Design a protein with these regions (language model features):
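ATP-dependent carboxylate activation and anion-phosphoryl transfer catalytic cores
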Residues: 1-166, 304-307, 312-326, 353, ...
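ATP-dependent carboxylate-amine ligase
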Residues: 3-63, 492, 579, 678, ...
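Conserved N-proximal alpha/beta basic substrate-recognition cap immediately N-terminal to
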Residues: 99, 103-238, 242, 256
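Residue-level signal for inorganic ion chemistry
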Residues: 164, 419, 508, 546, ...
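Walker A (P-loop) phosphate-binding motif
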Residues: 194, 469-512
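Flexible active-site lid/hinge loop adjacent to a nucleotide/diphosphate
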Residues: 515, 519-626, 630-634, 669-671, ...
Length: 862
């Protein structure tokens, strides 16, 4: 078997609305020999966790489906072995023999992709040899763990993201530095670990300057250790005398995670060693008085005390039998311990500091300490070096709370970790000769959310409440538009209408990403990346997002839901691409847009398309319908129940809600309808008006938007762009499927002169679809020029042109039909041949180039 393609989805998708993170594998099972029972027995020897999922006896599935299911189960199991909680998966046969789509959940994208490849390797090996080498499986699991560590969010970030998700606040991971955006557009905030966009850079700089922090706190009357800073060991003895003599603490001026710190230094010899260790981290070294006591981390968020944890340095307790080395090994087997931030605790690693600390206690790694004796292994109590935490939130004295809150305000940190050394946190720090020894920006949350002893504290909630106070918005209005035809025009029209409200609108279309009036990126930008460009922009107040089939298939939706989901229609286009082989498959794919519409929002549906109407049964939002037929039974029933609709009634675009009716504008006064002749643009205008109205845009603002939106190369490039060229006209439209051709045919019928067509077709369409375009063209035009796209999409030259010609000749073998493969030459030839009062209709591949040719011709007339 072999993998043909691996895709990773990152949002609501064809396979699942709730499970956003999915791997989709297109798998060719090829020829295989299979004895199910023995294969399954061998598989369970390699992966015992699959033993309870005995599908070998299922008679309702073929051997091929069985193997595809096994690959899925292996991929899920591999991730489970390394602690990733994934359980969703499914398989689907394609129309091609023995080719399947295998779908399963992931937590870390690269781990999911690795699991897919490993699952195929394991399955193939068991098919061919009956086993899979243990060392290879262990290597796979090691690689997966490494990938997971590299790709997962840290525990502090994860806790904040989890709290945001619990409050239905959307989030986006920005770049590769664990920066997270919470909220969309103009309402966003950002965090990086426990730094936020509200964290002042001066406060962070001050907190990183340990000596400067201590000086400011001392000057403010805060109890801090006496200390000084030196750069050379020749000043060491003077510095020790200055702080009051031994015992002392030696630490780097700019350090973190306990690196380079030595505590309870009692001799000059020890001090020299400690100085060298500190200078490996920072050129400047702090010498300060050592306060005897326990290490406590007090967390202050937005000026308020949140939690306190006692931190205990990494240690082992003697059992009278085992060596310290063995005790460390036993301790590291605790399932709560992992590498780095992989788990709630970190494995203890022995380094030079550990050896020195053991030596000061009279031990080596081979020593066997007496039963019950605690042997410390680190100088500091950081969890990242193997320490443990004990929650003391309910024990701290009110005066210590007041002091910690004051310290956070003095330094200026919105999120501060304040280290207090005291024998008893329940007593005022001044009474027990304690001190504030450090103030930390970006404090870790793990010691509070998952203490080794005591009650876990939800310290992420105050962060979210600081960033988003009560009633503060986290989302901007999102309108998502999908369908086979009319998406781009409707998207642009909705965006234009929203601009009448005075808000900054970001929108994506098949011709580019726009914010306000500015083009951000040119191209076919209707996928999830383009949507996130808009949602990440801190100036955008409304997002209008064209959401096309291709992006949904490749990556899923780029956002978790919309306020309005619009489905224009579902027509037979792109069938056979991406294993979407039937129109029902296509409808299911496009329904993702409305199945994710928020319960408070609206699904705006085409009442004239049965496939679209059927989507109403699957949505959680309210439903609104649009129709060219004011007498539609569905519309009448819907508004009788108090529903919202838009219809074309007596020449007017009209909004209906229950017994209420409001005429927006007469269609002939809406420029995009070309005087009411472009029926499909009347329909597009209904959908746009309804979407805007559902979001409280006023009728007057909608009317103003409709009146100022023109089917031009500036506002709707490639969509019903009509040019006057002296004695004749030219029309440029990006119609590229049967439904699009039929819509243009309806417009042509109202044209008094002859119609000439310049036609082409995308090469990735089925032969029968291309032939149908030729057949339709034969009924539309009196003369036809056939051209080909520059990108043939896998076809040989002339194949598409010949299929189009075949379709034309099947309907009318006598129609003048000229093949000119180059698009520019074909357009020029058609323009040259145009008689008086005729209409040259161009269906371009390259819209801008086609418009440029016509504009150049027009400029010569003036």
């Amino acid at each position: 078997m072999k993998i043909l393609k691996i895709q990773t989805l990152r949002g609501p998708n064809y396979w699942s609305i709730q499970r956003h993170q999915l791997v989709v594998v297109r798998l060719d099972l090829e020829d295989f020999q299979l004895q199910r029972t023995s294969f399954y027995q061998n598989l369970c020897k390699v992966l015992p966790s699959l033993a309870g999922k005995d599908i070998a006896q299922r008679s309702d599935i073929s051997n091929a489906t069985f193997l595809a299911e096994i690959v899925k189960d292996i991929a899920i199991a591999l991730q489970g072995y390394i602690g990733m909680k994934v359980d969703f998966g499914t398989v689907k046969p394609t129309v091609e023999n023995n080719i399947y789509q295998v779908v399963f959940e992931y937590q870390t994208e690269q781990a999911g992709r690795y699991a897919a490849r490993a699952a195929v390797r394991i399955c193939t090996s068991i098919l061919e040899t009956g086993t899979y080498a243990t060392n290879e499986l262990q290597e796979d699991l090691k690689d997966l763990r490494d990938i997971r560590l590299d790709g997962q969010l840290g525990p502090s970030t994860e806790s904040i993201v989890a709290e945001a998700k619990a409050r239905n606040i959307p989030w986006i991971e920005l770049g590769s530095r664990a920066m997270i955006q919470l909220g969309y557009g103009v309402h966003q905030n950002r965090i990086q670990a426990t730094l936020s966009n509200k964290t002042g850079i001066l406060a962070v700089e001050l907190a990183c300057d340990k000596d400067g922090t201590k000086q400011i706190l001392r000057d403010s009357g805060v109890p801090v250790p006496r200390g000084t800073t030196i750069r050379s060991p020749k000043y060491l003895e003077d510095a020790i005398a200055e702080v009051g003599g031994f015992p002392i603490v030696i630490k780097p001026l700019n350090g973190n995670h306990g690196r380079g710190i030595t505590i309870d230094v009692r001799t000059v010899k020890e001090a020299l060693v400690a100085f060298d260790m500190a200078q490996e981290v920072s050129e400047e070294v702090i010498i300060e008085r050592f306060h005897l006591g326990r290490d406590h981390r007090i967390l202050v968020i937005n000026g308020k005390f949140v939690a306190v944890a006692e931190r205990v340095p990494a240690n082992v307790t003697g059992d009278g039998v085992s060596s310290i080395s063995q005790l460390i090994e036993i301790t590291n087997k605790d399932p709560r311990r992992g590498d780095g931030h992989d788990n709630v605790l970190t494995r203890i690693e022995i380094d030079r500091t550990s050896m020195d600390i053991l030596a000061r206690q009279g031990f080596t790694l081979e020593s066997v300490p007496p039963k019950g004796l605690v042997c410390y292994l680190k100088a500091t109590a950081n969890l990242s070096t193997g320490g443990v935490s004990v929650d003391r939130t309910d024990e701290i004295h009110p005066e210590n709370i007041w002091l910690a809150e004051r310290v956070a305000r003095i330094i200026g940190l919105d999120i501060a970790g304040i280290d207090m050394v005291t024998e008893d946190i329940s007593k005022p720090v001044r009474q027990v000769d304690g001190a504030i020894v450090e103030v930390n920006a970006a404090p870790g949350f793990r010691m509070h959310t998952a203490p080794s002893i005591g009650k876990p504290r939800n310290v992420a909630a105050p962060v979210i409440e600081m960033l988003f106070p009560p009633d503060a918005p986290t989302r901007i209005p999102i309108v998502a538009i999908t369908g086979t035809n009319g998406k781009t025009t409707t998207t642009r029209l909705i965006a234009h209408i929203f601009k009448q409200t005075g808000k900054r609108v970001g929108f994506t279309t098949t011709d580019g990403i726009y914010i306000g009036e500015c083009l951000v990126e040119k191209g076919d930008t209707t996928g999830p990346h383009s949507a996130q460009v808009i949602l990440r922009d801190p100036t955008v107040e409304v997002a209008v997002l064209e959401t096309a089939r291709g992006g949904l298939l490749r990556s899923g939706m780029g956002f978790d839901g919309s306020d309005v989901g619009v489905v224009m229609n579902v027509q037979a286009d792109h069938l056979g691409i991406g294993d979407i082989d039937t129109i029902d498959d296509l409808a299911r794919l496009k329904s993702v847009v409305v199945r994710t519409t928020l319960p408070t929002g609206y699904a705006v549906l085409n009442a004239e398309d049965p496939l679209v109407v059927a989507m109403a049964k699957e949505v959680e939002s309210k439903v609104a319908y649009f129709s060219m037929n004011p007498d539609s039974p569905l519309i009448k029933s819907h508004i009788a129940d108090g529903g919202l609709a838009a219809v074309y009634e007596e020449g007017y675009l009209t909004i209906l809600k229950g017994d209420w009716k409001m005429r927006i504008e007469e269609a002939v006064n809406v420029p995009v309808t070309l005087g009411g002749r472009a029926a499909f643009n009347i329909q597009n205008s209904l959908a746009a008006s309804l979407a805007a109205f559902s979001q409280h845009v006023t009728i007057e603002q909608i009317r103003q938007g409709l009146a100022t939106f023109v089917a031009s190369s500036e506002q709707t490039p490639g969509r019903m762009n009509l040019f006057e060229l002296g004695k004749f006209h030219a029309l440029v439209d990006y119609a590229h499927n049967p439904a699009g051709f039929k819509a243009i045919a309806d417009f042509i019928q109202k044209w008094e002169g002859e119609a000439i067509g310049v036609i082409g077709a995308p090469g990735d369409r089925r032969d029968e679809d291309i032939i149908e375009l030729g057949q339709l063209a034969a009924n539309m035009f009196g003369q036809i020029f056939i051209k080909e796209d520059k990108d043939l999409r896998g076809r040989a030259p002339r194949v598409v042109a010949d299929l189009l010609r075949q379709g034309v000749q099947e309907i009318n073998p006598n129609i003048p039909c000229i093949t000119i493969l180059d698009e520019a030459e074909a357009i020029s030839a058609a323009l040259d041949s145009a008689p008086q009062s005729s209409l040259v209709v161009v269906f371009p591949d390259k819209v801008d180039a086609a418009i440029a040719i016509i504009e150049a011709r027009k400029s010569k007339l003036s």
